[in-house]
């Protein structure tokens, strides 16, 4: 009994060292609550009630897609505008188009799907798949354009043949329609995203017109439309860089907050 009572007295007593140690303990937050505006800025998707716990446990994959997008579209836009004598409609960038444009965007699309972000999943997945298709079309191993050449084996000649140009222009037409749909959905997020899809819609419209004019040997108008497409793509690239910088600044906690023109408030007011 004496031993048991001694143990109770010993455990009931707290040494000054223990009190000092307990007093020095502080609570460290392990999670951060994002507002609807912050969520839409980081994930480029409206905040819904169906957001799962994974979005709190995993990193934000959206900047990865933006990085792949801008590093692909920026040099391609310079090529389309013919800067420093660049030619070839992007054939020189086949590798970056497939691995940076296609690979990173499709990878991000899968990650957005896991997080439950439907809109960016669809956007990055379809644009990434387009880059895969565009790059593969220019790759001789896929033999997509060679049958349109006179020798049926020359990919470069096939890419500039009237039959190929008339046919491939339809892909640009419907990509433009898809960008228009994305534009309507982006009005729920922010103004920068809306501007990106606006310029991308123009890019595909100009490219389809350019291909059809070049198919009838109207090089003057066709080349001007290609330059116009390159200019619009360059604007989209700069907007993409801006959005990427804004997201990366927020991700590392820099005090500089770049405005992106939140549009969710407009829709919230309309809902009321």
Swiss-Prot record:
Q: Where is this region: Disordered?
A: 1-21
TM helices/strands, residue ranges: 63-83, 91-111, 122-144, 164-184, 192-212, 225-245
Any one GO molecular function term: acetate transmembrane transporter activity
Q: What is this protein called?
A: Protein alcS
Q: Which domain of life is it from?
A: Eukaryota
Q: What's the source species' lineage? A: Eukaryota, Fungi, Dikarya, Ascomycota, Pezizomycotina
Question: Where is the protein situated, by its record's location annotation?
Answer: Cell membrane; Cell septum
Stated membrane topology is: Multi-pass membrane protein
- Keyword set for this entry? Cell membrane, Membrane, Transmembrane, Transmembrane helix
Q: Name one GO cellular component term.
A: cell septum
Report biased composition (Polar residues) as residue ranges: 1-14
Which source organism does the UniProt entry give? Aspergillus fumigatus (strain ATCC MYA-4609 / CBS 101355 / FGSC A1100 / Af293) (Neosartorya fumigata)
């Amino acid at each position: 009994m004496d031993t048991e009572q001694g143990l109770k007295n010993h455990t009931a007593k707290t040494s000054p060292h223990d009190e000092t140690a307990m007093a020095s303990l502080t609570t460290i937050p392990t999670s951060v609550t994002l507002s609807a505006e912050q969520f839409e800025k980081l994930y480029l998707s409206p905040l819904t009630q169906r957001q799962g716990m994974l979005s709190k446990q995993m990193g934000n994959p959206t900047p990865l897609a933006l990085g792949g997008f801008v590093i692909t579209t920026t040099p391609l836009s310079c090529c389309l505008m013919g800067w420093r004598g660049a030619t070839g409609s992007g054939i020189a960038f086949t590798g970056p188009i497939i691995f940076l444009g296609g690979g990173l965007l499709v990878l991000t699309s899968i990650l957005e799907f896991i997080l439950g972000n439907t809109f960016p999943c669809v956007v990055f997945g379809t644009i990434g798949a387009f880059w895969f298709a565009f790059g593969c079309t220019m790759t001789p191993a896929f033999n997509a354009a060679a049958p349109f050449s006179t020798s049926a084996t020359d990919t470069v000649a096939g890419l500039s043949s009237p039959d190929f140009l008339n046919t491939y222009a339809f892909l640009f037409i419907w990509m433009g329609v898809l960008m228009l749909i994305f534009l309507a959905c982006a009005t729920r997020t922010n103004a920068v995203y809306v501007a990106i899809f606006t310029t991308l819609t123009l890019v595909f419209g100009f490219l389809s017109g350019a291909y059809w004019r070049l198919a009838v040997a109207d090089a003057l108008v066709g080349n001007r439309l290609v330059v116009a497409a390159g200019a619009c793509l360059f604007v989209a690239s700069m907007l993409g860089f801006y959005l990427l910088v804004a997201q990366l600044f927020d991700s590392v906690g820099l005090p500089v907050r770049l405005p992106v023109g939140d549009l969710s408030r407009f829709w919230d007011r309309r809902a009321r």
